[in-house]
């Protein structure tokens, strides 16, 4: 921990706008230990939010679900946190002046995170229309990070048959989300397997072009708006 704080400190020297949650926050015993700090109850969670504030964090990142199970199409690695718990987590962060970025997968979990007030959904794999409408109606920005799947096809680490199905499902969902009017934004999940920093966001852009059409001015404008909303939301007031 602390690397992102150092990165933010030196970023202006390179012309980079760098914002950080300092660390992600996850429920003890659930996914998130690789990037964050755990809590067992709401008091511990609130204390972690206050620590982020003390250390100058720009926003709060919470982990409400596991990750995709790449061995099978359509499943997430663990049961999501409950709605009431997520709602309280978002409320506490908002009360401290933070926006909330939620690592969330699965239709019900995405829908509930959006309704709970999460400002953005990172990943959002396996959403359904109800979840998409929830994101639209609650002005939640959706950052699909679909390049994580695309870049692994053909690498031999997982079944290409499964990866292709996940890619096709994700592509259809992005297309439908765009049609519905969900605010989409580019994000790469850089640091994931075969998603290097810098190149990852270029790969994500290429995925969106493949899904929504190359040289589509409306798509470009929509994604620029999404980037603007992310920059606007994720800075501590």
Each language-model region and where it sits:
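Structural detector of well-ordered beta-strand residues that form the stable sheet scaffold
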Residues: 19, 100-103, 122, 141-143, ...
